[in-house]
């Protein structure tokens, strides 16, 4: 009974916080409520018995990404920027994206994961029978490196492409921008560095 009450509490609070994230105009408040959503999801994962996933979610999303978003928003001082477009302009695209998302969920539930089961779930194991012989981390690692090994490698390639893209963007330099050259600064003569100018009165 207590777990059911906690489940409804965390799920309801997460839904309310998520709605505030997309409805509030102040970006600082939006990021704060996003952090609250992450905390509620951590509570739901703890109720499901996934301690490792909950702590990983807390460290990665709350401790790194959400705090980074909050610092960036506070540094850029975006809280006074007003929305130039109307509400119906954003509501149309938001409704379109939500309809596509719900349609994809409907297809996945009706297809019973036929694509995933035919390629990745052939070697699945009944983990309920071995619940007391394996820890949560061992079960997660076994499933990740056996049944979902292809998806794990694909996610690694996605991260590699993101890293290479960031490096390529930083390597591009414009010729019009003046930059400091340490080699030129070191070899300069002291006599040519300091110059005295006399101003006529």
UniProtKB/Swiss-Prot annotation:
Core subunit of the mitochondrial membrane respiratory chain NADH dehydrogenase (Complex I) that is believed to belong to the minimal assembly required for catalysis. Complex I functions in the transfer of electrons from NADH to the respiratory chain. The immediate electron acceptor for the enzyme is believed to be ubiquinone. Belongs to the complex I subunit 6 family. The gene is ND6. Its EC number is 7.1.1.2. It comes from Cyanidium caldarium. It is a multi-pass membrane protein. InterPro entries: NADH_UbQ/plastoQ_OxRdtase_su6 (IPR001457), Nuo/plastoQ_OxRdtase_6_NuoJ (IPR042106). This is NADH-ubiquinone oxidoreductase chain 6. GO terms for molecular function: NADH dehydrogenase (ubiquinone) activity.
